[in-house]
């Protein structure tokens, strides 16, 4: 049976995680939401198939102590978490399973289930001014807005641990990027290149490979989404160093590029390069 792809999304409050998830689920019936367990009482406005309700905090704590909960958070006097049973159940459906998680939650799931699940992590962010405007429109308390904007810089520093970074300044463009990520991940499609392969240099590749092998992070590699595929536009040497070492890199979607069509010769040359350096 085909395994499911788990797409975990993190980001600041107000960045639009729930909106993006809802839109993706509307457009693709193969995408399902990963249900959480919670100890808070049900609400009238709760959406269907979002939570499994646990009677009390004590009952939830028993699940934790019994090792049934993979990842959890305590918020507003109640527990929220994902059960191992739910993860394993969804893993065999051959679906795209999507869920918003905290940075710590994504880290925990990766650490504990990396060898059992196919996981892609996305850090959803937005320009600070856009985020502030959204919080104001949501009638968020001024003190809370100030607090969240203060946390913005710290949250931005977390994005390097994710496979992809997507700026949600425009919803339609964000959905196109997310669809490219999902398409590439489910179909195991390689990243293609708009950047000229003539800019690939052995010495630079070796330098970046040495950094990665020492556990150092490289600057995010810039990519774009075109027709459901992911194209590299800057960072070819860093990307090839990643293939050579098998170490983690960070791909960030950008819109600051000239709208040029991929050149067939460059795509073929890039395929040769990736095959040469792929570990």
Task: State the predicted function of each range.
Residues 18:
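Walker A/P-loop
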Residues 15:
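ATP-binding Walker
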Residues 9:
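Hydrophobic anchor at the beta1->P-loop junction of P-loop NTPases
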Residues 12:
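P-loop (Walker A) phosphate-binding loop of NTP-binding proteins
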Residues 140-181:
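Small-molecule kinase domains that catalyze NTP-dependent phosphoryl transfer to phosphate-bearing small molecules
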Residues 98-103, 115-138:
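Conserved phosphate-donor/acceptor-positioning beta-strand/loop module used by diverse small-molecule
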Residues 38-97, 103:
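ATP-dependent small-molecule kinase phosphotransfer cores
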Residues 186-274:
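Short, charged/polar connector segments at secondary-structure boundaries
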């Amino acid at each position: 049976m085909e395994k499911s792809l788990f797409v975990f999304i993190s980001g600041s409050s107000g960045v639009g995680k729930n909106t993006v998830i809802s839109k993706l689920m509307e457009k693709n019936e193969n995408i399902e939401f990963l249900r959480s367990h919670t100890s808070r009482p049900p609400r009238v406005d709760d959406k269907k198939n979002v939570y499994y309700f646990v009677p009390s905090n004590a009952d939830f704590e028993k699940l934790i102590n019994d090792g049934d909960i993979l990842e959890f958070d305590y918020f507003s006097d109640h527990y929220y978490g994902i059960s191992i049973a739910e993860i394993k159940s969804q893993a065999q459906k051959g679906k795209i399973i999507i869920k918003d998680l905290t940075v710590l939650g994504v880290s925990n799931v990766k650490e504990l289930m990396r060898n059992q699940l196919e996981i892609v992590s996305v850090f959803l962010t937005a320009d600070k001014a856009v985020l502030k405007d959204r919080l104001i429109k949501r009638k968020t308390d001024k003190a809370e807005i100030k607090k969240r904007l203060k946390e913005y810089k710290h949250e931005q520093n977390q994005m390097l641990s994710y496979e992809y970074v997507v700026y949600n300044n425009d919803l339609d463009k964000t959905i196109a990027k997310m669809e490219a990520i999902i398409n590439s991940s489910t179909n195991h499609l390689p990243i293609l290149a708009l950047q000229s392969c003539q800019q690939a240099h052995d010495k630079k590749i070796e330098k970046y490979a040495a950094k990665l092998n020492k556990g150092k992070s490289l600057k995010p590699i810039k990519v774009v989404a075109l027709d459901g595929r992911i194209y590299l536009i800057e960072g070819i040497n860093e990307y090839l160093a990643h293939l050579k070492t098998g170490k983690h890199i960070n791909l960030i979607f950008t819109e600051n590029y000239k709208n040029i069509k991929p050149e067939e010769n460059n795509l073929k040359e890039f395929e040769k390069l990736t095959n040469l350096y792929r570990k």
